[in-house]
Amino acid sequence: MGDLAKQHRRFDEHHLAFFGGAPVLYHCHHFNLFLDQTIDDALGAEQGARLRTEAARESAHALLAGLAAGVGAETPVERIALAQQVFAAMGHGHLAIDVADGGGEARGTYLHYGHSWSEKYGRAVKRRTPADGFAAGFVAAATEVAFGLPLGSVRARESACVAMRDDACRFVLERGEPVEPRPAVDIAATEAVLRPSEPGLHEERIETIARGLLDYLGTVAADERGLVQGFGVFVTLHLAGYYNRLSYEAVAHVRERAPGLVPVVEALLRESGQVCVFHTFGGILLSPEWEGMVGAPTGDVEAHVIGCCAIARALGFGRWSIAELEPDRRLVLRAPLTYETPYHLARHGQATSGSSYFLQGAGVAFMELAHRVPWRDEPKLSDAFYRSLFAKGQSWKAEQTLDTAKGDERCEVVITRAR
């Protein structure tokens, strides 16, 4: 089989990444767990788990089909081995898949969702439902691709989960019903909606830091558990299609059944961006690698926002730029598009309101952390600190004034004082 490294592609100008033709980006376990919980809260545990599994199956099917074609994996054995290798390399843990075209079983060890949930919450809480919807969908997709079956032909159910204090994660696979393919959200779909990038403030500095961080990320690999642990978090290379289907279908579901609750769901989706910036960006800013490359954070607002924009670019979130910055008053972030934009346009058409939930929440977190975290004291960015920071509400608010998904020339989010 061919070299997997050659299956990575990046739009350097726009800071968007692809693997096997599928849009990908880096996210941490705090974001992953928060988003999954938001979906379950919005839809209910049963329907939320179904959506999470189906979104994973769909996005993983596209990934694995692209990779199998790219590296020349032709037989079921080769394709199952490829799926197991890719899953671990992306930081999701290890899968042992034993299937035929009619179904089978799989066993997971150190699965990203179940393991990180146990690490974060397991000492205090026993989970009542399985946590690994993503792994379940991935196993189903791996089986479909291995045997050349159409999407939907295999269903997977997690029958045991370490987050429920079982000894291992186990999955049962059985025949399903093929589903109608949806519009592809791939390299071609992304290219079709690209907008020219525009230089922002401190552009050269942001880009220099982003390139340095990209070089560093290129040296990071999964450990023997199939996990990537760094910057105080578990990091995954993840599928943008998974995140986007969860977010936008949850909003659509609530809008149809309980429209008055849409603002609540949208606020939680924005908070997922806030959670990511607090834990992942904060962990990077406090890391020895960052200190060696950029210098330890000092609490300088301008330097903080410059660093955060560089991190966003390196992680594959898009070409985030600073259009305006007045410390203690106002921040304007812009991007030609984000990883959310192509999906919304392909699957939901033009948006009627700001749809870049992650960009909105992240922008708020940029200013919250810049103004409220004592960086010189090298704080521990724990859940307790996060709760204490936001216990009395946010000091900053976001308004998305422009959105490529609405037909505008760029995405723009304005962050101002909330109180």
Spans of model-derived segments:
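N-terminal accessory segment detector
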Residues: M1-F134, G148-F358, A362, R372-R419
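Extended, Lys/Arg-enriched charged tracts that mediate electrostatic binding to polyanionic substrates
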Residues: A136-E144
